[in-house]
Amino acid sequence: MSDFYGPQHWETLYREGRMPWDAGGVPAELAAYLTRQPNAGRALVPGCGSGYEAAALADAGFDALAIDFSAAAVARAREITADSRARVEQLDFFELGDDDFGLVYERAFLCALPPARREDWAHACARLLPAGGRLAGYFFLGPTNADGPPFAIPPDELKALLDDAFERLEDRPVEAPLPVFGETERWQVWQRRDDT
């Protein structure tokens, strides 16, 4: 795999302060979700970046684990989450064991992956979430572009990736999409089916 997708690429972006995926806080849809979603136990934030969302999840009562394979992202997230109970670890999402999480939170992780890893991502989400567990967050929808990351994903492809193991519960426009994603960013919640 090209280092363009490896830790060194992301280290450089963090060192140079080029983080167009960083919302600088907790997005409105996640904040609203946390007010109406009962504590589902453990929450995972893959590709956690600065970690704002991990702190919000911990503050809402989740046992939040934020992971990133970039040491610079982990250092930044540890600073931002220092006053919360969130744990931040330098780990590769695809190397996680068979832990069960009640929630996997998505923002700017799937679109940072090479499109060839999308199926691996979907299988990992299904493996990490038991029946009733939820995959919730923001998805950059649109035709797959060759000049990413970020890589948009066609809505039909996302549905095909997740439909066997998940049922979509929510799908709506984002109140304040990140400029890098524009109006194609959607808030979605998917619940793990019990029959797969």
Question: What spans do the regions from the language model cover?
Answer:
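Short catalytic micro-motifs in class I SAM-dependent methyltransferases
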Residues: 108, 112
